[in-house]
Structures are given as structure tokens and as C-alpha cells.
From Swiss-Prot:
Protein name as it appears in the record: Ribonuclease HII
Family that this chain belongs to: Belongs to the RNase HII family.
Superkingdom of source: Bacteria
Cofactor note: Manganese or magnesium. Binds 1 divalent metal ion per monomer in the absence of substrate. May bind a second metal ion after substrate binding.
The RNase H type-2 domain, residue ranges: 30-221
Protein's organism: Mycobacterium ulcerans (strain Agy99)
InterPro entries the record matches: RNase_HII, RNase_HII/HIII, RNase_HII/HIII_dom, RNaseH-like_sf, RNaseH_sf
Entry annotated with the keyword DNA damage: no
């Protein structure tokens, strides 16, 4: 039986970072855009989603591209302006913590991917997503297992999202001192858990996450008990 192209099922990492995109381009399905997110598992800060379409002749200029989690911070920062310069189009979306709480992480992730693709200044012929399907896109799409290490456009989107979020979390560390956002970027490290317990949650913490909810519940309970223990206030007048 002949194999149809593009495939209709989830595919796994190809033999090279640009193999899949090149095949799609040769099939007349370009430009190919990749979409990826950062901050899905963090208990504070936004979920950041980026979409990026790379030109077929720009791969050599971005030879260091890889899954952003495998790159050093220095390499990511070096790649960020290069991706912005050489991309056909890119768009970064920030989903705030309150929206993550309201929608749930997965639904917020899907919505962020839709917004990121819709925000591209160049309409892609095909979209590759990292790991799971993105329903509701206006163009054909395909999920790629380990996509940020399998397709250059997804790797580029991963770097854009990661650097954008990291920079925001460093700024947030100044806005909400004491939590250590510049270090752990909102993830549930031991230091973050200790700070959260001591300070209580700030407006950027995700109340839908159980560790934040537990601290918030304890803080609210302690505040209620303190109010109940306060003596009656003196009042002027007759009674």
C-alpha cells in the first residue's frame, strides 16, 4: 500500500533536525511553521507560546539550533536575535497565570498555540507542533513527538518562548522580591516552595496548582483566625 504524505498520525523524531521540514517544503506545503510552549509545569508566571516559520535557505545560519532545554542560557540568548532576524515570521504569546487557572493548563496551551499561529505575519502552509495535536488551526498540522529536537522550526519556537519567558521572570523577580523568580523561573524548586510558604502566593502564582492552593488556603485560614482573635474596636458615642 502506498504511503500518503503528509502522514495523518503522530510521528517521532526524524533522522535530522531539518529532514521533516525539507520533505514538507518539497511537497509544496511550505512555509512550515513550528509551535512550542514553555512554562507548562511552572506554578508561577505565564505560559508562553511561540510560533516560528523559517526560510528554507536560513538553516545554515542557525546551525546551533536544538531543543531549548538542551541549550545553555548563553547559547539561547545568542540564538534569539538570529532567529528573529532570519525567520520568515514569528509570534510570541503570553498566557497569564489567571487565564491558566481559569482554562486549565492544557486548554490554555492549545489556545496559546492557536493565537501564536494566527499571529504570524506569513500564512504557513503547514504547522508542526511539539507532541500533541492543536485542533482549530486554519492550516494542516501534525504533532511531532520530541518535536523541539526533531524539527528546526519547532526548535526555533522553543528558543523564542524560553528566552521570552526567562526574561519576563527575571523582571518579575524585581516586582515580587523574595520568591527567587530570577533563579527558578516559577518552577517548584525547594527554594521556591520555602519562599511560597513564608511569603504566601503573589498575584503571579497559579492558584489551580495544588502546592499554591494549599499555601493560599493556610494563609487565608490564618488571617481569618487572626481577625477573630482581635479585640473589639472602641467606638465613640452613646449606647
Amino acid at each position: 500500500m502506498a504511503t500518503t504524505w503528509p502522514p495523518r498520525t503522530v510521528i517521532r523524531k526524524s533522522s535530522g533536525l531539518r529532514t521533516l521540514e525539507s520533505a514538507l517544503q518539497r511537497s509544496g506545503l511550505g512555509p512550515v511553521a513550528g509551535v512550542d510552549e514553555v512554562g507548562r509545569g511552572a506554578c508561577a508566571g505565564p505560559l508562553v507560546v511561540a510560533a516560528c516559520a523559517l526560510g528554507p535557505n536560513r538553516y545554515e545560519s542557525l546551525a546551533a539550533l536544538d531543543d531549548s532545554k538542551k541549550l545553555t542560557e548563553k547559547t539561547r540568548e545568542k540564538l534569539f536575535p538570529l532567529i528573529c532576524r532570519y525567520a520568515l515570521a514569528y509570534h510570541v504569546v503570553f498566557i497569564p497565570s489567571v487565564e491558566v487557572d481559569r482554562r486549565g493548563v492544557h486548554v490554555a496551551n492549545i489556545e496559546g498555540m492557536r493565537r501564536a499561529v494566527a499571529g504570524l505575519s506569513v500564512r504557513p502552509g503547514y504547522v508542526l507542533s511539539d507532541g500533541f495535536r492543536v485542533p482549530g488551526l486554519s492550516v494542516p498540522s501534525l504533532p511531532v513527538i520530541g518535536g523541539d529536537a526533531a524539527a528546526a522550526c519547532i526548535a526555533a519556537a522553543s528558543v523564542l518562548a524560553k528566552v521570552s519567558r526567562d526574561r519576563l521572570m527575571v523582571a518579575m523577580d524585581t516586582q515580587y522580591p523574595g520568591y527567587g523568580f530570577a533563579e527558578h523561573k516559577g518552577y517548584s524548586t525547594r527554594a521556591h516552595t520555602l519562599a511560597l510558604t513564608q511569603l504566601g502566593p503573589c498575584p503571579e502564582h497559579r492558584r489551580s496548582f495544588i502546592n499554591v492552593r494549599r499555601v493560599a488556603t493556610r494563609s487565608n485560614g490564618a488571617a481569618t483566625a487572626e481577625r477573630e482573635a482581635d479585640p473589639p474596636q472602641e467606638r465613640d458615642g452613646t449606647g
